[in-house]
Design a protein with these regions (language model features):
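Bacterial Sec-dependent N-terminal signal peptides
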Residues: 1-11
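Non-catalytic cap/lid and distal C-terminal segments of serine-dependent acyl enzymes
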Residues: 9-192
Length: 192
C-alpha cells in the first residue's frame, strides 16, 4: 500500500522580461506570474496589474511579496481564479507611475499605450475591462488609485493599499517637484 502523494502544480514567475518603450525612450522591465495551468491549457486569463512601492522595482512582489506562493495557494484553495499578474518597474531613471507635469516623462502614457497592449498580446490575457484589475502598495497604491480614476474604462477593480497620493497643497506639490528636479509652468501644474 502506497500512500497517496499529492503533487500540486505551481505557477511560474519570470522576472526579467522587458518592453522597449518609444514613449520613454528606453527599455522597461516587468515581471509576470503565470498560473499553474498556463502551459497545459489554451484558455485565456484575467489579469492583475500589480504595482510596487517606492524604492522597489518589478521584482519586489516576487522577492518580498511572495507572489508565486501566495497566488498558487489562493488558486489551489479555490479562493482565487487562475490569473496572470503583471508587475512593471516604475523605479528606473524616474520614480513613479505618472506623467510629469511638463510631460518630459510619460510613464502613465507608457503604461496604457505600450505596456498593456504588449503584455495582453504576448500572454493569453482576456483583454477587456471585465477581466482587468489594478492594485498596488504605497507608491503603487497611488498609481492604482489614480489609474482607476483616470481610466475607469480600463479596470473592473482597483485595490490601492496604503496608497500614497501625493502632496495635499499646490505649495507642497511645487516643493516636491523641486526636490525631484522636476518643474512645470503654473498652467502645467494647475492642469496636472
Amino acid at each position: 500500500f502506497l500512500p497517496f502523494l499529492g503533487i500540486s502544480q505551481s505557477g511560474k514567475v519570470m522576472d526579467n522580461l522587458s518592453v522597449v518603450s518609444k514613449i520613454l525612450g528606453m527599455e522597461r522591465k516587468y515581471a509576470v506570474y503565470l498560473p499553474p495551468d498556463y502551459y497545459t491549457s489554451e484558455r485565456s486569463y484575467p489579469v492583475l496589474y500589480l504595482l510596487h512601492g517606492a524604492g522597489d522595482d518589478h521584482t519586489g512582489w516576487v522577492q518580498f511579496g511572495e507572489v508565486l506562493q501566495i497566488t498558487d495557494k489562493a488558486i489551489a484553495d479555490g479562493k482565487s481564479t487562475p490569473m496572470i499578474i503583471i508587475m512593471p518597474d516604475a523605479d528606473t531613471k524616474v520614480r513613479g507611475y505618472f506623467n510629469s507635469p511638463d510631460n518630459a516623462w510619460k510613464y502613465e502614457d507608457f503604461f496604457f499605450d505600450e505596456l498593456i497592449p504588449e503584455v495582453e498580446k504576448k500572454f493569453r490575457i482576456k483583454a477587456s475591462k471585465r477581466f482587468r484589475a489594478v492594485a498596488g502598495l504605497s507608491m503603487g497604491g497611488g498609481g492604482s488609485f489614480m489609474y482607476a480614476l483616470h481610466r475607469p474604462d480600463m479596470f473592473s477593480a482597483a485595490c490601492p493599499l496604503s496608497a500614497y497620493t501625493g502632496p495635499l497643497s499646490m505649495e507642497a506639490f511645487k516643493a516636491q517637484l523641486a526636490n525631484r528636479s522636476m518643474a512645470g509652468t503654473e498652467a502645467q501644474l494647475e492642469a496636472y
